[in-house]
């Protein structure tokens, strides 16, 4: 330990040295503020103090001095963000100072020997609220509150944002001489000459809070008096301190019998059974070090190899009228260090540096002394993450305590802007037809993945990028086509020229800088850069195309005829329907929803399925609340296993032309008394054959099993070799949809029940689920006149986790939550007309995307996990767009929304709906386990709430990502779980990406800089380049 006491570090006068009543160190550890009896607040350079022994050190010692009080200054405190400096004096006034970036206007004070100021600290506010001397001050950890106490026995709470008086607490019966805040931001404690310490519970107020909002805030939690029953009233202060882990309060001027002591109050039950005895006279102040310490030197690789870390302790310094500085820690019952006669008079205040290795002591003899410890003397300083972990059990952390106006904040902002600029250059290069430099600029993304050219695989190999499609439309052609649409002129009957109206969203432009909502048809073949990850759709392949408009549905009581497909409609040739009906935008293909061909269909014979007869309807359907149309009995059904596309009418001979193509063929007899035959062939060779007593309606299969659903409501399964896997499953009615995905099988029956089976485990994740809830919800939005038909089921799929995904003809998309046992709506037309992110072309966060992940069956991502639910959310939103455009409601509803925005009270409608849409996407991606979509939508959401300056949501998002800050004592799930992973991503990686996006918003630096420091994101340019090179080598 080194004691440093420069002769110039004092409040000296012409004839004597004035008392120093208070001292405090700034959060960045660069400034020391002192206050004394000369009525001055002085700001010193900590670096100059540490180098006082160096005669060659020429930098300024005193940075500034302020004399805006009319008497003795008793307390001086920096705000946790370093933005403000508060002082309280015996003139009953509290002064708030802030650092002006402009240089000081004067060189030195006239008539004094004061050195010229280096920094320009100006008076920002003068707070009037006390009737007597102000004895002590304290800021809340999140800077939202400033609390002052004084000799008028009052506790005055001020807003840390507006400095308005929020509340006055008059609960003490004598002078209040100490105040300290809980680092978890839940309580504060005050010490008084009435020989009590009172604990107050509070909720951090909003920046614009007023006195009326604080009526029920700041509630007295408890009052502690046992350790102070016989404490003397001769001390000038009773400065108490709260431990950095939130477990204890150290209270000065306590007694244990006849001996002066320091009382340690435990947070759990507010007990005060522990006393620190080591002073011969009453103590004035005790102060915990802001850092936790290891009792033994920790191993650098302890976290990597899973070894247990050494125990953590807190360190406390105390001093008082015996002129002795005593250092304690929680690991020993005796003091670690005792320094006697450290001053010639009483010690009035203590202040630790942020690193916890130096403590300053202010004395009434007019001097300030620094005790600087070497590494290991007090212990080994733990990382700041340990403070956060210790505070998590109390529902708080050191959030928002970062310095906003320091170099770290500038580094974070520069890093954020650099990443955004690289992404912008990449997108601009792609639009201008110059992808080379753009790919070079964005060779490395934030997570280390290289998306350009070749993508690094997990085993070190490289995978070539897919070739570009030659038929893609360039950006210039797209602009010309849009301009042509805008300038399309029509001539009316009276000869006047009029410009044809164009849907605003189709032009791709907008007045706002925010993403514009666009309803883009899925049939477009141009390479539109959207905000959806380019991944393979994780849904079962709909080989059996559903009728146009989906499977018709009827709910009980709608007074309409039972919906059954008419013979005339089905027997109408497909070519005639294509010529007379509306042009489809998308069609059901082998791999899901595919764009419809823009060119005219080829001439010749159009294959048409041969229907034998309608299926026999089960009598149960007459008593069901939901009734779905049942498919007709077809003469034969072909189901290929490979990716080759085969029409249902293709003969077995044509199917053998597809190499390695395994085909399951079901042949139904013309007579009902004959059995149905089902065969599996490979290259025309028979693999296996089986017979069923009833006609087969639907077939499905994967590489794990085959399945067939029959007219009598039975469901049969076979292994790939043709071995029956289980007895026939008896369904309540005829099947209408049969889908397979990996080991999962979905069967939807005519009464609207969805059955899901895991063939590998021979189990079901949940009982049969009815479609009635989603059809009822859809029906409530129909016209009261009943002119709009009931929505039909356009598709029902399974993902690789066995989750049901259903779309309706009104555009709504749903999935069934196996954890909530309820249907949840993921996509609807409400977002299409109100959100700015619907089919948005804004891809400002596309530089943060990872490369696409391969199919579920074989490909793995970098984390070793399959890409579950990939592409489901974009697929459902494209379906909503398709149905929206087909029904012609887009233009009308967008006009209604624009008219709504012009009304009073709806100014923030579009912004609120857009943010809610992103939250809906994030919730859906998280519930489905869509790893890529979750990360992308999370970054889009962070960028938007940062631009909207929604600090509450930003703080909650950062706390949720860091893990467990908002959870209760019991372990939760999802966001509130104790796991290090969140939707397959490491929480630290997600937090780093969000902090990087939010780094450019200076108003949020109070929240983001602290997280950036934890993640080592506040490095300079040279350090940053070194770190980036290391990341590239690692990747």
From Swiss-Prot:
WD repeat copies, ranges: 15-54, 68-107, 129-168, 171-210, 232-275, 299-338, 342-383
Entry keywords, A to Z: Chromatin regulator, Nucleus, Repeat, Repressor, Transcription, Transcription regulation, WD repeat
Main location: nucleus
GO cellular component term of the entry, any: HIR complex
Localization annotation: Nucleus
CDD domains: WD40
Key word Nucleus present: yes
Biased composition (Basic and acidic residues): 408-425
Gene Ontology biological process terms from the UniProt entry: chromatin remodeling; DNA-templated transcription; regulation of DNA-templated transcription
Keyword Translocase: no
Region (Disordered): 393-479
Entry-linked Pfam families: Beta-prop_CAF1B_HIR1 (PF24105), Hira (PF07569), HIRA_B (PF09453)
Classification via InterPro entries: CAF1B_HIR1_beta-prop (IPR055410), HIR1-like (IPR031120), HIRA-like_C (IPR011494), HIRA_B_motif (IPR019015), WD40/YVTN_repeat-like_dom_sf (IPR015943), WD40_repeat_dom_sf (IPR036322), WD40_rpt (IPR001680)
Function: Required for replication-independent chromatin assembly and for the periodic repression of histone gene transcription during the cell cycle.
Family of the protein in this entry: Belongs to the WD repeat HIR1 family.
Protein name: Protein hir-1
Lineage: Eukaryota, Fungi, Dikarya, Ascomycota, Pezizomycotina
